[in-house]
């Protein structure tokens, strides 16, 4: 069965939802591998190490622009299938880029509010340069064997519970 046959037999809404969800999953996989590559590439690693030494981030908007720009290479070819498929795929990629940029910044500025994961916080805090590459989730770290759990000490857990809001982060 080729893609055009599948496209012609499924209802339009199902195709849009499928492409959107597939793009979210694909975006998370790309995020994982790009971050892992940053830790294993000498040239890119030098630039990325500045991020680790300063333990600060560019802000949600700048991170999003960087992620969206890098993801664009994976967006435009899908438009050859159809406009509908291309749009749903691109929106999925951009939604994940926004979620990832927000999660990344939140784990730097206010990790207690990142209730779905603290993997990136742990990656930085405990210098796990060969572990925990996910920014917004740990799924691919678990799949590829790079997940390394770390139990926060009770005092550290208390310190993380600071009274900051979900939007109390660097945006620019």
Model-derived regions, located:
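Membrane-proximal soluble regions of multi-pass membrane proteins
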Residues: 107-172
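Alpha-helical transmembrane segments
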Residues: 11, 15-26, 88-93
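Transmembrane alpha-helical segments that form the membrane-embedded catalytic/substrate-channel core
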Residues: 24-39, 93-112
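Cytosolic, membrane-interface loops and tails of multi-pass inner-membrane proteins
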Residues: 38-56, 114-123
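Short, amphipathic, aromatic/basic-enriched membrane-interface segments that mark the entry/exit
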Residues: 53-65
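Core segments of transmembrane alpha-helices
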Residues: 62-81, 134, 138
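Short, strongly hydrophobic alpha-helical membrane anchors
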Residues: 1-14
């Amino acid at each position: 069965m080729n893609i055009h046959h599948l496209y012609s037999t499924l209802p339009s809404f199902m195709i849009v939802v499928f492409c959107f969800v597939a793009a979210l999953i694909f975006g998370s996989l790309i995020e994982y591998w790009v971050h892992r590559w940053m830790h294993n590439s000498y040239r890119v690693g030098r630039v990325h190490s500045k991020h680790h030494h300063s333990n600060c981030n560019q802000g949600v908007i700048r991170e999003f622009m960087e992620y969206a720009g890098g993801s664009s290479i994976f967006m435009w070819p899908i438009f050859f299938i159809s406009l509908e498929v291309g749009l749903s795929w691109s929106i999925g990629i951009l939604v994940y880029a926004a979620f990832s940029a927000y999660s990344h910044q939140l784990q730097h500025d206010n990790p207690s509010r990142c209730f779905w994961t603290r993997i990136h916080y742990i990656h930085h805090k405990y210098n796990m340069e060969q572990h925990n590459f996910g920014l917004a989730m740990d799924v691919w770290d678990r799949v590829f064997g790079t997940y390394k759990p770390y139990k926060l000490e009770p005092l550290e857990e208390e310190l993380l519970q600071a009274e900051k809001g979900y939007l109390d982060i660097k945006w620019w």
